[in-house]
């Protein structure tokens, strides 16, 4: 899953469980990878609620078609300071799965935590 993700912090901070079923993030990697523009109090609140993530989402094949998924209007919010999915990868997604509009935010991976009102305003405008 991380192939072609040069610049992503994920490779250095993720821990796959012994049974291969879940991924956790090393505690010292959580803020720089996902919440770099959040204050420490917000990150502490988030960390109290994080749980291991299933690896199934990364292993399960997905089948799409241009007639079905390709016909759904899409928008994308580029997060320029994202350390989980580097900007070049986000731009690749937009190029290969056209989105209109593409909104660029100078935020980390998680604008829903660092700039929730601004993000909500963008989403409301899209609706």
Residue ranges and their predicted role:
Residues 1-27, 57-63, 85:
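Flexible "cap/lid" loop of the alpha/beta hydrolase fold
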Residues 22, 65-68, 91-94:
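Short secondary-structure boundary/capping segments
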Residues 28-37:
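Helix-loop "lid/cap" segments that line or gate small-molecule binding pockets
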Residues 48-68:
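Active-site nucleophile elbow and catalytic-triad environment of alpha/beta-hydrolase enzymes
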Residues 69-70, 75-78:
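Short beta-strand/loop motif that positions the catalytic acidic residue
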Residues 80-106, 113, 125-126:
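Conserved loop-alpha-helix segment in the C-terminal half of the alpha/beta-hydrolase fold
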Residues 116-124:
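Short, amphipathic alpha-helical "lid/cap" segments that border enzyme active or binding sites
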């Amino acid at each position: 899953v991380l192939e072609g993700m040069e610049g992503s912090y994920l490779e250095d901070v993720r821990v796959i469980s012994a049974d291969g079923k879940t991924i956790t993030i090393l505690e010292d990697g959580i803020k720089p990878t996902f919440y770099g523009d959040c204050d420490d109090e917000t990150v502490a609140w988030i960390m109290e609620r994080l749980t291991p993530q299933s690896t199934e989402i990364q292993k399960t094949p997905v089948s799409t078609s241009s007639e079905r998924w390709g016909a759904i209007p899409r928008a994308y919010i580029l997060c320029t300071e994202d350390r989980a999915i580097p900007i070049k990868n986000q731009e690749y997604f937009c190029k290969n799965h056209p989105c209109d509009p593409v909104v660029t935010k100078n935020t980390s991976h998680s604008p829903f935590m660092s700039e929730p009102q601004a993000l909500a305003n963008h989403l409301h405008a899209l609706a």
